[in-house]
Amino acid sequence: MVLQTQVFISLLLWISGAYGDIVMTQSPDSLAVSLGERATINCKSSQSVLYSSNNKNYLAWYQQKPGQPPKLLIYWASTRESGVPDRFSGSGSGTDFTLTISSLQAEDVAVYYCQQYYSTP
């Protein structure tokens, strides 16, 4: 029997200021992945979060486990926070981004959020 691990994906909306609302949409809503297999979570921004002056994408990924605050995994779309296992990786640019867990572990069961920080209230 294949052990299935449910990875719950959620949606984070970040309301911007002068640039107009930037809406972040994640897919899929939930994902069933076997332990040891790859999990892929997509995030789409309603407008580009790539800042042309420094060529950086203002996009972060967070992991939240029950009863705990969100933990930063990835910033600048693809830079892993210190201490985050290398099975977590981020990719994408402009409006389309992906978080990949290359080999899902039991401790990875959580809610995952993408967040733009290109514009803030």
Swiss-Prot record:
Disulfide bonds join 43-114. It is found in: Secreted; Cell membrane. One of its GO terms (molecular function) is antigen binding. Residues 83-114 are annotated as: Framework-3. Residues 115-121 are annotated as: Complementarity-determining-3. The keyword Signal applies. One of its GO terms (biological process) is adaptive immune response. It holds the Pfam family V-set. Keywords: Adaptive immunity, Cell membrane, Disulfide bond, Immunity, Immunoglobulin, Immunoglobulin domain, Membrane, Secreted, Signal. The keyword Signal applies. Residues 1-20 form the signal peptide. Residues 44-60 are annotated as: Complementarity-determining-1. Residues 21-43 are annotated as: Framework-1. GO terms for cellular component: blood microparticle; extracellular region; immunoglobulin complex; plasma membrane. InterPro entries: Ig-like_dom (IPR007110), Ig-like_dom_sf (IPR036179), Ig-like_fold (IPR013783), Ig_sub (IPR003599), Ig_V-set (IPR013106), IgV_Light_Chain (IPR050150). Residues 21-121 form the Ig-like domain. V segment of the variable domain of immunoglobulins light chain that participates in the antigen recognition. Immunoglobulins, also known as antibodies, are membrane-bound or secreted glycoproteins produced by B lymphocytes. In the recognition phase of humoral immunity, the membrane-bound immunoglobulins serve as receptors which, upon binding of a specific antigen, trigger the clonal expansion and differentiation of B lymphocytes into immunoglobulins-secreting plasma cells. Immunoglobulins are composed of two identical heavy chains and two identical light chains; disulfide-linked. This is Immunoglobulin kappa variable 4-1. It comes from Homo sapiens.
